[in-house]
Amino acid sequence: MEDRLLVTASPHIRDHSTTRGLMGNVVIALLPAVLASALIFGARALLLVVVTTFACVAFEYIYERLLHKTNTVGDLSAVVTGIILALNMPVGMPLWIAVVGAFVAIVITKQLFGGLGYNFANPALVGRIVLFLGFTSRMTAYVYPDMAVDALASATPLASSVDRHAVSLLDMFLGLHGGMMGEVCVLAILLGFAYLVATKTIQVTIPVTIVATVFILTTLNTGDPYAALIECMSGGLLFGSVFMATDYVTSPFTTKGKLFYGVFIGLITFLIRHFGSMNEGMSYAILLGNLMTPWFNAWGHQTPLGYKKPKKAKKAAEEGGKA
């Protein structure tokens, strides 16, 4: 009987979740997108994923080795960063540029700030933004699925969203159009999302709130729900909502905070897409959301049961004088 009693100090939290287990679930959830990109764009897509992931793992191992830090390669976080970063690139991206992105993501964004748990933003997200700013022409060199790697598409469905018939909904659902490797196939993203929710790796709050906000605002702005649906299925909205905005370290942990965070990202994405100079604003919206996370947590903090707000000093003095 005594062996069944807990005699340690509180809090008594019993959870079998580990960083490696959670990251392993994310890797599994990313596999449909990886497989879809290989089927749609060919073996070059797999090569880009392998090289980028290997570079992320290598940079993490070398950095920690040189600075005599505990090796964290085994927690799979670098693997997740590598896969997500690769899926945020077009299939024709030169491999050396992918390695540059891996360096920015792992060394600059993650390790220099203290490693996993201390980074200010999602490492893969920062890597994508830096590559987009530094190699814009390469990052926008989209490839049609049925063409060779050097045959470039003129625009993605998001850029062509004015034309309702530029790409059919079925083609968008199956990924039969140009774009970033991991963003084109809606089916693969939804399969990964379903797995993450089923394994309780993430909650639905953030992704659903982001997509719903963009859909509602776009419908109100255009008066066309079909156009809003096209916007939600194109670009990096779905992929970013599921795999990047839900990062444990850089997203809120309170329920209200998650709602504020999702609405904020959806709002910024909508504003950039419709009133900014870029077709896609998801990356910048998530980055701003990451930076705002401490405030979202503070605003969403639940008041303890039985808590009584202290009276202001002046009001308390007046009541004391009346007494």
Which functions belong to the PLM regions below?
Residues S77-A78, I83-V149:
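Membrane-interface helix-loop-helix junctions at boundaries between adjacent transmembrane segments
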Residues M1-T53, V57, E319-A323:
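N-terminal signal-anchor module of multipass membrane proteins
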Residues A58-T70, I106-G117, I189-K200, V242-S251:
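C-terminal ends of transmembrane helices
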Residues F120, A124, L229-L237, K258-F260, ...:
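Loop-to-transmembrane alpha-helix initiation sites
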Residues G276-K309:
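Membrane-helix cytosolic exit motif
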Residues A29-A36, E60, A78-A86, A102-I106, ...:
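Hydrophobic, membrane-inserted alpha-helices
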Residues G117-L190:
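Long hydrophobic alpha-helical segments that form multi-pass transmembrane helix bundles
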Residues G42-A55, G92-G101, M172, L176-V186, ...:
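Structural signature of hydrophobic alpha-helical transmembrane segments
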